[in-house]
C-alpha cells in the first residue's frame, strides 16, 4: 500500500471524491457527482478506494509547492481500442502507463522520479495527448 500511496503523491490538505449515481447494465458509469474535500488523505481512504467503496478517491497531483510527480490524460471517449493505444505507446517507447477508466475510457499516466513544475507536466501531457489523437482530452494537473 505504501508504494501505491507514494506513487500517487499530491496535495496533502485536500482530495477529490466521486459518487457514481447511475450505471449502465454493463457496469460503466453514466453520471456521477464529484467534489473536493478539504482534509488530508488517509490510508483508509486509499483502502476504501482500492476495494471499490465509494466515494472514489481523486488525488490532486499538484503539491503545496506547485510541483507534481505524476499527471494523467483522461480520455472520456468510449468504444476505445485500448490495445491500439497500448501498442502506440509501446511503439514510440513513451514513458506512459494506461488503464481503462470506470466509464470505459482511459487514464494515461506519466510518472516522474522527482517532483517537476506542474506547468511542465501539463505542457508535456497536452503535447502527448495531441500526439496520441486525444487533443481534446482532459489533462491533470489542471
Predicted regions: what they are:
Residues 1-70, 79-85:
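DNA replication initiation on ssDNA origins
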Residues 55-57, 70-71, 96, 106, ...:
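A broad, low-specificity signal marking well-ordered, structured residues that form hydrophobic/aromatic
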Residues 60-62, 96-103, 138-142:
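Short beta-strand
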Residues 53-54, 66-68, 91-93, 102-105:
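Short, well-ordered loop/turn elements at secondary-structure boundaries
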Residues 13-19, 94-98, 135-137:
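Short secondary-structure junctions
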Residues 73-76, 80-100:
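Active-site-adjacent loop/helix surface patches within enzyme catalytic domains
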Amino acid at each position: 500500500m505504501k508504494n501505491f500511496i507514494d506513487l500517487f503523491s499530491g496535495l496533502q490538505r485536500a482530495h477529490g471524491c466521486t459518487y457514481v449515481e447511475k450505471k449502465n447494465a454493463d457496469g460503466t458509469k453514466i453520471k456521477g457527482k464529484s467534489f473536493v474535500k478539504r482534509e488530508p488523505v488517509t490510508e483508509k481512504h486509499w483502502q476504501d478506494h482500492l476495494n471499490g467503496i465509494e466515494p472514489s478517491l481523486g488525488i490532486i497531483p499538484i503539491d503545496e509547492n506547485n510541483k507534481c510527480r505524476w499527471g494523467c490524460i483522461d480520455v472520456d471517449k468510449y468504444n476505445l481500442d485500448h490495445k491500439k493505444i497500448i501498442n502506440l505507446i509501446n511503439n514510440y517507447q513513451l514513458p506512459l502507463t494506461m488503464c481503462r477508466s470506470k466509464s470505459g475510457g482511459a487514464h494515461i499516466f506519466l510518472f516522474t522520479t522527482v517532483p517537476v513544475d506542474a506547468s511542465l507536466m501539463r505542457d508535456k501531457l497536452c503535447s502527448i495527448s495531441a500526439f496520441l489523437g486525444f487533443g481534446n482530452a482532459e489533462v491533470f494537473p489542471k
